[in-house]
Amino acid sequence: MRKSSSPSLSNCNSVLANKIFGIPLDELQQGGHPDNEVPFIVRHVVDYIEEHGGLEQQGLFQVNGNAETVEWLRQRYDSGEEVDLVKEADVPSAISLLRFFLQELPEPVIPGSLHIHLMQLSQDYNNEDEFGRKLRFLLQQLPPVNYSLLKFLCRFLANVASHHEEIWSANSLAAVFGPDVFHIYTDVEDMKEQEIVSRIMAGLLENYYEFFENEEEDFSSNDLSSITEQVNELSEEEEEDEKLEHIEELPEEGAEKSNDMPEVVQLRMTENILESNSVTATSTHISPISILPASTDILERTIRAAVEQHLFDLQSSIDHDLKNLQQQSVVCNNEAESIHCDGEGSNNQIDIADDIINASESNRDCSKPVASTNLDNEAMQQDCVFENEENTQSVGILLEPCSDRGDSEDGCLEREEYLLFDSDKLSHLILDSSSKICDLNANTESEVPGGQSVGVQGEAACVSIPHLDLKNVSDGDKWEEPFPAFKSWQEDSESGEAQLSPQAGRMNHHPLEEDCPPVLSHRSLDFGQSQRFLHDPEKLDSSSKALSFTRIRRSSFSSKDEKREDRTPYQLVKKLQKKIRQFEEQFERERNSKPSYSDIAANPKVLKWMTELTKLRKQIKDAKHKNSDGEFVPQTRPRSNTLPKSFGSSLDHEDEENEDEPKVIQKEKKPSKEATLELILKRLKEKRIERCLPEDIKKMTKDHLVEEKASLQKSLLYYESQHGRPVTKEERHIVKPLYDRYRLVKQMLTRASITPVLGSPSTKRRGQMLQPIIEGETAHFFEEIKEEEEDGVNLSSELGDMLKTAVQVQSSLENSESDVEENQEKLALDLRLSSSRAASMPELLEQLWKARAEKKKLRKTLREFEEAFYQQNGRNAQKEDRVPVLEEYREYKKIKAKLRLLEVLISKQDSSKSI
């Protein structure tokens, strides 16, 4: 078994002498091994894991290594010592060391600028093939060192996932290494971003050979030498094509151009970049070293953009730069009027070029040849003195006149797109003066200034264009929007992507001041030069719909429509409840559990919704409380969103004015409380007569009581809705008969539902329906108590006879007699308690003193028992431990109940006397 240390370890001591952790990747490469773009420590650790990892172990990549071992290994690598991972480390520590190296990089393997594009791409894509192409292109934008390291890591993890798929899937490995590659913190707030990163990383692992190893589709290279070779080849081809073009473009009057003119893909972009870099490198102000990285970046992007556009129309990073490119005015020479184009089929109409990368995705009009921006290098060199004072550029528009190729039925020709620009001036191409804008696509009158010259390439003759009269191009309404008839439209439609209709939007004239502001077309939003307008907002594409299509409404009837724009609190409550419900459903789908209050509080947006919902509910409750005087104000129906705001506004206002007068009249005619009470009593009496209910409550059955209770409840609610709940003493006195009757009915209904207990001394009392205690009146219980005493004596004799007969059957006469005596004593105690209510004050005081003395005696006995139990067992006595003194506890409870009864009776008889 060979050691995991690399054979080149002894030769890399000079590399390891410097610090490894926390050092950028480009510095590590420049430090000692420029040929090997993967850091040595990564290769060393990965080789060790592949040989001695035991990757079939469950949870190997999720187990953290020993912190002390990882720190010791880091110090060894930083100090330049030779490390033998087989003898000095274990697999979890090696994996933790690898992840620690990735985490300590100053810039992640996926830089922040590219990280944003990847996140946006992952959220916006709809097609898997398109997502794969764009992701592959974005990966090629990585620096060479980062690309090599990412490729090496993905190859290692893809091998692990393929050989141990049951244990380590691509998703699980992506969840472990994704945050390390992208530098994503695993906090709760970044859970969504972490999921996106894990999904991207899993896609890289599952489709590793498609993204990294497929040489047929890997058109661009990260090597500067290969880029230079490609640029040189393209520049040589361009020179040959240019010579042929100059020969065929010599001006001859009355001569028609040949139909066999070669169609050449123009890559003058790269040629001008090389020329501009060579010119700039000779300057004394800027050193060639500072230019090299920028030129390299532009070269890379240029090659990739041209190849991607030619092969599969993929949007590149130059798209962002071209969107900021503002076109200057179209210029022509004074010789333009002297040269005329022959042939009726030639159509010389100028249009500003659309984005070169998104040409296949936008609508192109075949009737207008595509113009291209020419930032001529020779013109730049001539005007360099003026550029130091004024930050301007000379822009030439390279125009190709369209001529008949012999086929008059084909109204459109295939055209080439030219884009020549200076790389050093790319960031300065911003239009400073709006007076130079010449809008030729909006079908308006336009003047072409003749004082400026057209920039040419080399010493070739400039093809002058005659002055175009565009005044009568769209005067008639019979003109229709032209649509492409060439192959590129068909190819785009066959690519599987959704295409806009060629007649998607009717072009409109420039709006007048008094007209309503229309919506800009999508094509005019990209480069800001020509403003196109659409008639119908329903025909806008997705990006144009982002603009608000608003129209200034006239206040047809009155200015009170603004008040109706506000949503009612009920609508806002429903909207917030819907948002919160959607959050809860999403949370439950993700975590299989309903969100708790802490989960809601952790999300500031949802917490804000909850706070607003609470405020709105409180507002609605306050509004209901304000309207509780008796008038139920009808809620205004919310206005339909589909109807115009002025629809029916005058009618609504007239209705409101008419409704105000009846409200005032109703308030003036509101009946008094006494009249309302009389009306309620009259209605109750009529209902009792209709349902044949007795007037006396005592004669009512249980069903009658239920009906009476419901009627009283409705009556009381009606009274409270008219006058509110009675609060003051006068208000309660007025409605007191109604409330007393309701309480009595409720009490009798409750008593009627209780089943009486047979054999109990208080059976008669429980079965009887108690009269309500009326405030300020003395309640008389003497007759009931006497009846209970007589019943108690009879009951005791009956119980005695029954017990005697039962004891005779059991042949235990003595025990039966003792039981009878005990029962009689208990009954006597109950009788004394009942008779104490009719006793005088001295008798009550005497019973009170005796009860207190007996209570004191029992409490002393129980306390002694509890203390002895505590000393014996070391704990307090529980309920099951009180069996020896159970009778004392029962007596103690009875004495306490008797004391409470005596104190109440004494306080009722004479509350002024102190006990």
From Swiss-Prot:
UniProt-listed GO biological process terms: regulation of small GTPase mediated signal transduction; signal transduction
Keyword presence, DNA-binding: no
A GO cellular component entry from the record: cytosol
GO molecular function: GTPase activator activity
Site (Arginine finger) location in chain: Q62
Biased composition (Basic and acidic residues): 661-671
Region entry Disordered, spans: 487-521, 621-671
Residue intervals of the Rho-GAP domain: 23-212
Entry keyword set: GTPase activation
Record keyword 4Fe-4S present: no
Pfam family, one: RhoGAP
InterPro entries: FAM13 (IPR039102), Rho_GTPase_activation_prot (IPR008936), RhoGAP_dom (IPR000198)
Residue stretches of biased makeup (Polar residues): 637-649
Family indicated by similarity: Belongs to the FAM13 family.
PANTHER family according to UniProt: FAM13, PROTEIN FAM13B
Protein name: Protein FAM13B
The gene coding this protein: FAM13B
